[in-house]
C-alpha cells in the first residue's frame, strides 16, 4: 500500500461558502472528486428553493431544529425530522427543505457522486 494523503482537520472557521440555494446557507468542509461534506443552516420559518443534487446521493443528519422535507409529485411527499434523524435523498430527487420551527436548523450533509452538487430548479414535476 502506498502513502496515503494526510488526515485533515477542518474547524468551523475554515469552512467555505457552499453552493447557494435561496433560504439556506451551506458551508463546505470537504470537496473531493466524488464526495462533498458540509454544514447547512436554515433560519427559523424559512424554506429553501427547489433543487436537486444531480448524480449525487445525499445523506443529511439533523443536528438541531426541525426540518420539513418536501419532494415527490407537486411536492406532496412531506417528512418532518428532528435532532438525531437522517434523511436520504436519491440522485436527481427534486426537493426543498423548510424550517417550521422558531430556531435555526443545523444539518450535517454528505454527498457522494460527481458533477454539479446543487442544481436549483423552478419546482417539482406534477
What kind of region is each of these model predictions?
Residues 33-34, 55, 74, 102-103:
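Short strand-connecting beta-turns/loops that link adjacent beta-strands
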Residues 59, 88, 103-119:
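A short hydrophobic beta-strand segment most commonly corresponding to one strand
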Residues 41-43, 54-69, 110:
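Short, conserved beta-strand element in jelly-roll/cupin
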Residues 39, 52, 71-73, 99, ...:
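Residue-level recognition of conserved beta-strand positions in structured domain cores
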Residues 21-22, 38-54, 91:
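Conserved short histidine dyad/triad with adjacent acidic residue
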